A protein has these predicted regions:
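Acidic, low-complexity/disordered segments
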Residues: 1-10, 122, 126-151, 298, ...
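Assembly/oligomerization scaffold segments
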Residues: 1-406, 434-440, 444-455, 488-493, ...
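Surface-exposed fibrous attachment elements
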Residues: 6-17, 179-212, 253, 442, ...
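Surface-exposed, non-catalytic interaction/assembly patches
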Residues: 34, 38-40, 138-155, 434-448, ...
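Short, conserved helix/loop micro-motifs enriched in His/Cys and acidic residues
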Residues: 183, 416-437
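Short, well-structured active-site flanking segments
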Residues: 460-464
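Stable alpha-helical structural segments in soluble proteins, enriched in small hydrophobic residues
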Residues: 666-680
Length: 798
């Protein structure tokens, strides 16, 4: 329930039900012009009414009747052809905020959304307006990344919950800080990796590469810095933390880059006290460079390293201990990052400068002194950023790497405070995914499909905040109500309904099991021409990709020293065979767009470069990845033979829809079990419950219904539908739809002897053998009578 001030609570306690309201259109107060209003919200689903609290999406609707003002009629002011100076207030898409209350208390949020349509009857003084809630913000085309990584490792890479979070983020409904620079703008910063870790390693910016064993971690909202975190619960042998990594969406060059790597952690949750972010660099040949920032909260140290797999390149390490006491004593949420400057080139190599940033649980932020590596200790020869790696032993959320920064971010810029508002809330992660299903329709359509497949509810509340609830929310029946409604005081009418369609004691959930499916290379897409990349400029190409093919990362830069089996390209200073390959000069960015793979190559040098291979031909090659087989169809079944439910109601089957979102038998079994537990007995529905208006009631609230005058019941029920309407005079009517939290126990049928479902067989009146023998003692008698078979069978002589 919504919280109310003392004046509202006093008015409700005294029985005051004269409604007050405040209505704004486009930010302008039009309260005095509202003649009537109605707000409706409920869970929408194709399940029987008694089941709908467990699955579906809610989209609220507001209807307003608006009068004119200042001597001008409403149609004159607000019709579709009205002057924009007044008509835009009621145009489709305009913002609407509606608040309601009772007595003299403060108004409470009742609706927040946008106008859907307007209708003005000429000659009248009213305009009818219809608005829908924040679900209208989710009408853009739904898009989700489809990385191959889960099939490559045979491990989950995301979950249905992560997909919901990503669809919300696309619409601006955020659960954690957004990517710093999501859009590509030439010369501006660019987000290379943004992994929320909200139930998955997938990301729309970058691509997961290394996935940890699911036995070693869990997803948890408890103690998460913002919404949900990756929490280690076991370590692989010899490791200090669990490891996950991502390819950046653009392979930026070193030298030539300034990077900000960051993450949020909770050092009070997990199994250790260390966390590290690595920037792995792909150098000439098989050599690998690594720039790292590591935190140890037990030691109170921050350590930066610049290392190389090539023994000819010396490594180095630099340490800060300026905030050791705080690191050792403060337990809670930390935000840490490293500003890495590898822009300048000195003798064809970068000398990294690293500045750490840490924000403690108490809000204090420390910015370390720059640590600069030297040619003798920690240089990084020319390379491209190949991988971002996280190694953590504590709860971690929001790994992000941004390139193109021109300077160290300020403390305010680092925190991203004031740049976003948390407007969504998730539930625990469910339905692990090895591959993300193809989706279509709007973001709201996709969220509704996921809600249906996972027995979850999706709703946008009165304040415009999104709430996602799993079926686990209803696993334990509540024992205490949020509000008590009685027939003596609050209830004017109610109807109690019970139907056998709400009983399901044999539940089946199909699954498409991806356990044996792996990733395999598809047909290589090779460029047909050698292309020129302008000096300090960019080149963009697109290649057709099939729907069944999964996302790929940016291609590697071929330097002629190793064989590259995946996607790659080679550049040289001349369009000719035998020209030496150039390394560390081109940023490569890849994205999927409308059935194509778009590749952008950016030249970081003042010399023209050409995409030419050693033989003089085109060098760009993209290797698609696809599943090597179809998933196996399986079924999760939940059934208790001979149960009381089956004895009294018969076997009632519910067969869940085949869904791409259920990808293993364990998840299917869990869903089937939840269905049977929830629906084993038909739960009553209380419909048309007319109550004294209470603006605090919300969907999902638990109310106690105490009826001593009619149905004689005392039960708890979930609110699954609310309809509230009011006229200009302040009269208000509120009608609830409720679903009982449990059935009324097991039937007893005391004193009853239920009739059999069918009558016993009718007596057999056919003639016996003795009767036939008596009627026809001899064969001659039978032949003489010449009876039909019916005559003989019925015992009637001819």
């Amino acid at each position: 329930m919504q919280s109310a001030d003392s004046a509202t609570q006093a008015a409700l306690a005294s029985g005051e039900r004269t409604a007050t309201h405040t209505t704004r259109l486009g930010g302008k107060d039009v309260t005095a012009q509202v003649e009537s209003w109605q707000v409706e919200r409920s869970y929408a689903t194709d399940l029987p009414a008694a089941m709908r609290a467990f699955s579906g999406s809610s989209a609220a609707q507001l209807q307003l009747q608006l009068a004119g003002t200042g001597g001008d009629s409403a149609p004159e002011l607000y019709s579709a052809w009205a002057d924009h100076a007044t008509g835009d207030l009621a145009r489709p898409g305009q913002s609407v905020v509606h608040e309601t209350g009772v007595g003299g208390g403060s108004t409470l949020a009742a609706f927040r959304g946008t106008l859907r349509n307007r209708s003005a009857a000429s000659g009248s003084d009213t305009v009818q307006l219809t608005a829908l809630d924040g679900a209208e913000r989710l009408r853009a085309p739904a898009e989700l990344p489809r990385p191959y990584t889960g099939l490559y490792w045979g491990r989950p890479l995301a979950s249905a919950t992560w997909c919901v979070d990503e669809l919300l983020r696309q619409a601006g409904l955020l659960t954690s800080p957004p990517p710093r620079a999501p859009q590509f703008v030439a010369g501006q910063p660019l987000t290379l990796v943004h992994a929320t870790l909200h139930g998955g390693f997938a990301t729309p910016y970058g691509m997961p590469e290394d996935l940890p064993d699911p036995r070693h971690y869990t997803w948890s909202r408890t103690g998460a810095p913002h919404e949900m975190a990756l929490v280690p619960r076991g370590l692989p042998g010899g490791e200090t933390g669990i490891t996950a990594s991502w390819f950046p969406r653009s392979r930026v060059t070193v030298p030539g880059s300034r990077l900000l790597a960051e993450a949020w952690v909770n050092n009070a949750v997990g199994i250790g006290s260390t966390v590290r972010i690595d920037l792995e660099l792909n150098r000439t040949g098989a050599a690998i460079g690594t720039i790292s920032l590591a935190l140890d909260f037990t030691q109170g140290t921050v350590l930066a390293t610049s290392l190389s797999s090539d023994p000819q390149v010396p490594g180095g390490a630099l340490q800060w201990g300026f905030n050791a006491t705080a690191m050792q004593t403060q337990r809670g949420i930390w935000h840490f990052g490293a500003y890495v400057d590898v822009y300048a080139s000195t003798n064809n190599q970068a000398l990294p400068s690293v500045i750490p940033l840490l924000t403690a649980p108490d809000g204090s932020t420390w910015v370390g002194e720059p640590a600069v590596f030297t040619a003798a200790s920690g240089p990084q020869p020319v390379a491209e950023l190949r991988k971002v790696r996280l190694v953590t032993s504590m709860a971690t959320e929001g790994v992000q790497v941004t390139s193109g920064l021109t300077a160290l971010p300020t403390v305010a810029e680092f925190s991203q405070a004031g740049t976003w508002i948390k407007t969504a809330e998730l539930d625990e992660a469910i339905l692990p995914l090895r591959t993300i299903p193809k989706i279509s329709g709007s973001q709201w359509d996709a969220i509704g499909q996921i809600a249906k497949a996972s027995m979850s509810t999706a709703e946008i509340d009165e304040r415009g905040r999104f709430r996602w609830r799993n079926f686990t929310r209803f696993a334990t029946a509540p024992t205490a109500p949020d509000l008590t409604l009685t027939s003596v005081r609050n209830i004017a009418a109610l109807t109690v309904t019970e139907e056998i369609d709400a009983c399901r004691n044999f539940c089946v959930q199909p699954a498409k099991d991806w356990g044996a499916v792996r990733a395999t290379a598809g047909d290589i897409v090779s460029d047909t021409v050698v292309r020129e990349i302008p000096a300090n400029g960019s080149l963009t190409m697109s290649y057709v990709f099939g729907e069944e093919e999964l996302d790929v990362g940016p291609p590697d830069t071929d330097d002629d020293s190793v064989v590259t089996t995946g996607s790659s390209f080679r550049v040289a200073t001349q369009n000719a065979a035998g020209t030496k390959a150039v390394k560390g000069a081109v940023d490569a960015l890849v994205r999927r767009e409308d059935g194509t793979i778009v590749l952008r190559l950016t030249n970081r040098t003042a010399t023209k470069l050409y995409t030419v291979d050693q033989s003089g031909g085109p060098s760009i090659r993209i290797v698609p990845i696809r599943p090597d087989r179809d998933p196996v169809e399986r079924q999760g079944v939940s059934y208790v033979p001979g149960s009381d439910s089956e004895r009294f109601y018969g076997r009632q089957e519910f067969y869940g829809e085949q869904s791409e979102w259920v990808q293993d038998l364990g998840a299917a079994q869990q869903l089937a079990q939840a269905m049977r537990v929830a629906w084993e007995y038909p739960v009553p529905v209380l419909e048309d419950v007319q109550v004294l208006y209470d603006p605090r009631i919300q969907l999902g609230d638990v109310v106690r219904i105490l009826d001593t005058t009619g149905a004689t019941l005392d039960t708890l029920a979930w609110v699954v539908g609310i309809s509230t309407s009011a006229s200009a005079g302040g009269g208000v009517q509120q009608t609830l739809s409720l679903r009982g939290v449990r059935a009324n126990g097991v039937p007893a049928d005391a004193g009853l002897t239920p009739d059999a479902p069918a009558l016993s067989p009718a007596p057999d009146t056919s003639a016996t053998y003795a009767a036939v023998a008596a009627a026809y003692p001899t064969l001659a008698a039978l032949l003489t009578a010449n009876p039909t078979w019916g005559d003989v069978k019925d015992g009637a002589p001819a």
